[in-house]
């Protein structure tokens, strides 16, 4: 516990909150254009080919974004909506592509958790 004299000498430093998704510039989502669509492998205990895309955002940043769900139609020059949210086993991937908006179609034959994958209600 500091004395009052010590607090006068040097005041308490305010805690600085750093954003986990700086490329969005405090917006909930950002539009961007895919510059490269490819697959990558996850960190040690896991094994897969994760679908990711390099996206140039309207904020000027170029980020790596994860493409969720099974199957996608994205290619170079596709216009996508990017939201925050990291992928734990892919280092450097701190953004997700929103399915079912702009050029990204929703996941086919999805019955549960449809809203997260832009899937329409089955008839």
Curated annotation (Swiss-Prot):
Family according to the record: Belongs to the universal ribosomal protein uS12 family.
Protein source organism: Chaetosphaeridium globosum
Compartmental location: Plastid, Chloroplast
Record keyword Cell division present: no
UniProt keywords, alphabetically: Chloroplast, Plastid, Ribonucleoprotein, Ribosomal protein, RNA-binding, rRNA-binding
Domain of life of the source: Eukaryota
Name assigned to this protein: Small ribosomal subunit protein uS12c
Pfam family, one: Ribosom_S12_S23
Keyword rRNA-binding: yes
Principal localisation: plastid
Entries under Gene3D superfamilies matching the protein: Nucleic acid-binding proteins
Assembly: Part of the 30S ribosomal subunit.
Gene Ontology biological process terms, A to Z: translation
Any one GO molecular function term: rRNA binding
SUPFAM superfamilies: Nucleic acid-binding proteins
Biological role: With S4 and S5 plays an important role in translational accuracy. Located at the interface of the 30S and 50S subunits.
């Amino acid at each position: 516990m500091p004395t009052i004299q010590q607090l006068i000498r040097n005041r308490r430093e305010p805690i600085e909150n750093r954003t986990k998704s700086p490329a969005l510039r405090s917006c909930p989502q950002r539009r961007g254009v895919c510059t490269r669509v490819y697959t990558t492998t996850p960190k040690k205990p896991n094994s897969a080919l994760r679908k990711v895309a390099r996206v140039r955002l309207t904020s000027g940043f170029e980020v790596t974004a994860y493409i969720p769900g099974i199957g996608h139609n994205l290619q170079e020059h596709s216009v996508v909506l990017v939201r925050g949210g990291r992928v734990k086993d892919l280092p450097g991937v701190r953004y997700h592509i929103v399915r079912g908006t702009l050029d990204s179609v929703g996941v086919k034959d999805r019955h549960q958790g449809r809203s997260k994958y832009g899937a329409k209600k089955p008839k």
